[in-house]
Swiss-Prot record:
Superkingdom in the source lineage: Eukaryota
Subcellular location: Membrane
RCK C-terminal domain span: 189-274, 288-372
Protein name: Putative sulfur deprivation response regulator
Chain's gene name: SAC1
Taxonomic source organism: Chlamydomonas reinhardtii
Tagged with keyword Membrane: yes
Key word Transport present: yes
């Protein structure tokens, strides 16, 4: 898992299966996670978030709050308040996915640099999620594990907010004060495309549908294009005509390479019979035969490759990208910089940002896919029109869910199920959208993690590890147990994933609390905060990875700006957990 060869969900599920076969755990232990109330709640809340997203509610509220301030710090502060408030009551991944194009458009309209807002956007979503028990999936996983051990344990809706709210306030102040000093202005991929149009190149193949086969370039209307020029023509036999004269005859199978601005590119891609091949240097070619439907309804997509994508460590050519996704790669950025050379030879890595020319259904198919950390329309400048009735209905139903859950009238899974049913019968959400929103990776991680956690208990491994941690942190006195769990969980989250970190660290936190003679709540809340407070790497938390491309960030940008915030989080979390949640038992 640490080396990234196999995903955390696969590792934990395989480990749980082996433990079951060896007789170390029972079948009920191996599958306890799938039947746990909190884990069912995660799946339901993900589907509810999809309903809020499809209705436009997630765009409506932040767009209203952001305003039109020309002062950067005002925009950052307003964004922090808006995003943290919404993230407190719903999963932060779909929220950030919706907010990225909203913030990009807002920055463009108000002359702000996106790199000063994208990382703060992720941090605001993370911090806001720490204010309630339903704010992040890791909170719900930890609650599920704790209540499985002690069904009488009460974890009120906003109790974790005793830590999360001060953290959120401190995070907002930190962003406003230190982003001008520590957060560099970076050129994003889309800014580079627009600012340097001569660098933007696309190649198309002439197929039988092109209406001007056998005619000259000039008579075909490809000579005096606005913001665009025909830089190269290559025949099927490999003969190349650089800067072809206007009298050159166009033949079926010709490869035409254009250079220019994005508006010109969109015009060329809209012509039936000109099928895109690739974009890069003039000699670059994916060396594959392309065929497809007319491109008039195709869109430009900005996408970030997830760490678990099946195309990771494969070249674009070997991944059969076009046939797999129905899309063509036009540009690839890594660590904030464009990868030059032939696109077909680029080895894909998790976190790469791609500009794609894709079919109109690409976003619908892959918006919630684990193959992509982010997929958004690259050139959407205005919010799509939404049905006002569906928007306010989705908000009203969701607010009712939050009120009922905060009053502890019904279990979260029950209120979430009622909310989801209301979304379905009112048409806010469809069954297919529900299926697409189910977080299979999280559920597999939890399903396997519950079994591994049980094995750590019955074998005594958790007890021994807890004793070792107590010895290492004994110099901190009463703060030792909480500091041990917070530090260990934060480290494990950076190496694995937050879901895996919670399931592996929970039995250690429980045994550590018993050995130290303190309440479970202190180490438990430290576990929740530690699993979600990875600010220093783009790969430690999903939303960090999502904003890395749109912000044009390099890896060390997260370390420079996020590591101090990581220490701030520790300095706030540990004392509060000790002073408020740890009376001696």
């Amino acid at each position: 898992m640490i080396r990234g060869v196999v995903d955390a969900d696969v590792c934990l599920f395989a480990a749980s299966t082996l433990l079951l076969l060896r007789g170390i755990i029972q079948a009920r232990d191996a599958f306890a996670g799938l039947a746990n109330d909190s884990i069912v709640s995660i799946a339901l809340m993900m589907m509810i978030a999809a309903g809020l997203e499809s209705s436009g509610a997630l765009e409506f509220v932040p767009e209203l709050v952001l305003g039109r301030s020309k002062r950067e710090w005002v925009g950052q502060l307003r964004m922090h308040i808006a995003v943290a408030s919404v993230s407190a009551v719903m999963n932060n991944t779909p929220l950030v996915a919706v907010m990225i194009p909203v913030v990009e458009s807002w920055c463009r309209n108000n002359n702000h640099h996106p790199s000063r807002f994208m990382m703060p956007l992720s941090y605001s979503a993370i911090l806001g999620g720490l204010c309630t028990i339903i704010g992040t999936s890791t909170n719900l996983i930890a609650r599920g594990l704790a209540q499985q051990d002690d069904p009488k344990l009460k974890l009120p809706f906003v109790e974790v907010g005793i830590i999360g709210l001060p953290l959120t306030v401190a995070g907002g102040i930190y962003v406003v004060l230190f982003s001008p000093l520590l957060l560099r202005k970076r050129d994003t991929m889309m800014a580079a495309v627009v600012a340097d149009p001569r660098e933007y190149v696309v190649s198309v193949r002439v197929d039988a549908r092109f209406a001007h086969i056998g005619r000259t370039i000039e008579s075909a209307g490809l000579r005096h294009l606005r913001g665009l020029f025909l830089a190269d023509l290559q025949r099927q036999d490999g003969a190349t005509v650089p800067s072809p004269p206007p009298t050159t005859i166009i033949l079926q199978g010709d490869k035409l390479t254009f250079a220019g601005d994005i508006q010109g590119m969109q015009h060329i891609l809209s012509l039936p019979g000109l099928t895109p091949i690739s974009s890069a240097d003039l000699a670059a070619d994916l060396e594959e035969t392309v065929a497809g439907s007319p491109s008039s309804d195709r869109i430009m997509v900005e996408a970030v490759v997830s760490l678990s994508s099946p195309i990771c460590n494969m070249t674009i050519r070997d991944s059969h990208f076009r046939s797999r996704y129905g899309a063509v790669v036009l540009r690839v950025h890594r660590n904030g910089e464009r990868i030059a050379g032939g696109l077909g030879d680029i080895v894909v890595k998790g976190g790469d940002t791609m500009l794609l020319e894709a079919g109109p259904d690409f976003l619908q198919k892959y918006k919630h896919s684990t193959e992509w950390a982010l997929a958004v329309d690259a050139f959407r400048v205005t919010l799509p029109r939404r049905d006002p009735l569906a928007l306010f209905m989705s908000l009203g139903i969701f607010i009712a869910l939050i009120v009922l859950n905060s009053m502890d009238v019904l279990p979260l899974s029950t209120t979430a199920l009622v909310c989801l049913f209301a979304y379905l019968i009112t048409g806010v959400l469809t069954v297919s959208q529900c299926r697409a929103a189910i977080p299979s990776s999280i559920l597999l991680t939890v399903a396997g993690g519950f079994g591994v956690a049980k094995a750590m208990t019955v074998t005594g491994l958790a007890h021994r590890l807890a004793g070792s941690l107590l010895n290492v942190f004994s110099w901190m006195g009463r703060a030792g147990p909480v500091a041990a769990i917070y530090a260990s969980t934060s480290l494990l989250t950076a190496l694995l994933s937050n879901g895996a970190a919670v399931t592996l660290m929970y039995p250690i936190a429980r045994d550590l609390a018993k050995q130290a003679g303190v309440s479970i709540k202190g180490p438990l809340y430290a576990l929740m905060i530690g699993a979600s407070s990875d600010f220093s790497t783009p790969i430690g938390y999903q939303t960090n990875l999502m904003v890395s491309g749109p912000g044009g960030y390099r890896f060390l940008d997260f370390t420079r700006f996020g590591l101090p915030l990581q220490f701030v989080a520790a300095l706030i979390t540990v004392p509060i957990c000790v002073l408020y949640f740890e009376p001696r038992t």
